[in-house]
């Protein structure tokens, strides 16, 4: 995996995924039926939301994951806490840790590693090729639109995506520019700062909008 550890598996039938992009990739490879558990960030495709949830990927519990009887756990290096990852590994259940980096190259490498783990290398190559083809089709604007992504979780908490986030990467891939570039990660932002960023578009997730 991305940590240099060797992960040995044999035709896994019960997979737990601990990242939205990992979940989406497994579904795209045609193996969604083999997923028995997902983390709270796994909102796409819609079928993923019907799987057993094991909590937010940064705060999962070994007991919740192992109770599903998985024969493979696929996570990113952002999953945790670390002692839980070690508990899963010590239980004998294979766990593959992939990079959570957000560049295009990192996303392609992640897809290829997941495809190799699941013996779907041909399908993985097709996914990567399709990604590259779609990127070439993105319309290039002389003045790319400024896009603001708000991750709302209710209770008045509105975190805005800065650089080095999956939202920032997706905005770039779609031909836009992030309206917020003066910090990395997600941070709260008040109404005045939101207006000052002068976005052309503001994005929410469906669930985030409902929580406001």
Model-assigned labels for residue ranges:
Residues 76-77, 97-100, 182:
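Short beta->alpha connector loops at strand-helix junctions that form conserved
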Residues 39-44, 159-186:
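Alpha-helical, coiled-coil/dimerization segments enriched in small aliphatic residues
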Residues 60-64, 83-84, 136, 189-193:
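Short acidic active-site motifs
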Residues 1-23, 120-150, 198-201:
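Bacterial Sec-exported substrate-binding components of ABC uptake systems
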Residues 14-79:
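A short, structured surface patch at a secondary-structure boundary
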Residues 83, 96-113, 144-166:
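Extracytoplasmic ligand-binding site segments that recognize negatively charged/polar headgroups
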Residues 68-73, 94, 176, 197-202:
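Alpha-to-beta junction loops
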Residues 79-90, 201-212:
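A ligand-binding cleft/hinge motif common to bilobed small-molecule-binding domains
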């Amino acid at each position: 995996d991305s940590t240099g550890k060797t992960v040995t598996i044999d035709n896994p039938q019960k997979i737990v995924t601990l990242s939205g992009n990992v979940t989406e990739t497994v579904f795209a490879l045609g193996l969604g039926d083999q997923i028995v558990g997902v983390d709270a960030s796994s909102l796409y495709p819609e079928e993923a939301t019907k799987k057993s949830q094991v909590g937010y990927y940064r705060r999962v519990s070994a007991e919740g994951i192992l109770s599903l009887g998985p024969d493979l756990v696929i996570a990113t290096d952002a999953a945790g806490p670390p002692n839980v990852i070690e508990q899963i590994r010590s239980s004998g259940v294979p766990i593959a840790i992939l990079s959570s980096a957000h560049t295009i190259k990192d996303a392609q490498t992640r897809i290829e590693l997941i495809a190799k783990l699941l013996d779907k290398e041909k399908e993985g190559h097709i996914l990567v090729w399709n990604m590259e083809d779609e990127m070439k089709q993105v319309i290039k604007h002389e003045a790319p639109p400024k896009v603001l992504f708000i991750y709302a979780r209710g209770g008045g908490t509105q975190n805005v995506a800065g650089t080095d986030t999956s939202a920032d990467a997706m905005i770039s891939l779609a031909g836009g520019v992030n309206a917020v570039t003066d910090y990395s990660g997600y941070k709260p932002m008040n109404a005045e700062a939101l207006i000052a960023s002068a976005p052309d578009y503001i994005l929410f997730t469906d669930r985030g909008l409902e929580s406001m």
